[in-house]
């Protein structure tokens, strides 16, 4: 990978590249440098990230420069993070996770799905949750069900609910809001 450029990565295709990156650890990824990681990531699609799995995606995410990661855009970030679980997210810097969430839109959160959104949200503290604001939290939580909210715990759910207003709750929809309330203590 160190001797390849973006054209070479494109010639490999996303599937082969995903398999290659899956077999690298975080130190190997860091040794490649930010520019190479960005080129590799831009070449991969949702299928390649699925081949990599959540742990390898987390390693890729934490070794990439924060600005470059956000520069990939919400769609790419959603395809990456939908393969991550709460334990994968916990290996990342909370500020990085917050910035990733800020870069995503409602369609990106829908792509991630409730389990990945819950994993992302479970790593955020009160400051991060309030920093996102009610509208962004509504975009995230409308993709979650009662089981997803259970991962968060009552205190985190309380922080989220305190940040949201009636319009945000309406945007969530009844099913998601019911799952949220069910898991409050």
What do the predicted segments below correspond to?
Residues 2-31, 35-58, 62-71, 75-78, ...:
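Thr-biased low-complexity repeat/linker tracts and other Thr-enriched repetitive architectures
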């Amino acid at each position: 990978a160190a001797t390849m450029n973006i054209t070479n990565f494109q010639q490999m295709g996303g599937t082969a590249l995903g398999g290659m990156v899956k077999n690298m650890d975080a130190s190997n990824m860091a040794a490649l440098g930010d520019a190479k990681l960005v080129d590799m990531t831009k070449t991969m699609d949702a299928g390649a990230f699925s081949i990599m799995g959540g742990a390898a995606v987390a390693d890729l995410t934490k070794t990439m420069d924060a600005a470059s990661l956000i520069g990939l855009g919400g769609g790419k970030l959603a395809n990456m993070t939908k393969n991550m679980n709460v334990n994968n997210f916990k290996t990342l810097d909370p500020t990085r996770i917050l910035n990733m969430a800020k870069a995503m839109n409602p369609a990106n959160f829908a792509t991630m799905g409730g389990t990945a959104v819950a994993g992302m949200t479970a790593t955020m503290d009160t400051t991060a949750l309030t920093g996102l604001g009610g509208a962004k939290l509504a975009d995230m939580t409308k993709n979650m069900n009662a089981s997803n909210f259970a991962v968060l715990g009552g205190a985190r759910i309380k922080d989220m609910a305190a940040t949201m207003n009636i319009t945000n709750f309406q945007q969530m929809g009844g099913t998601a809001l019911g799952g949220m309330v069910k898991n409050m203590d």
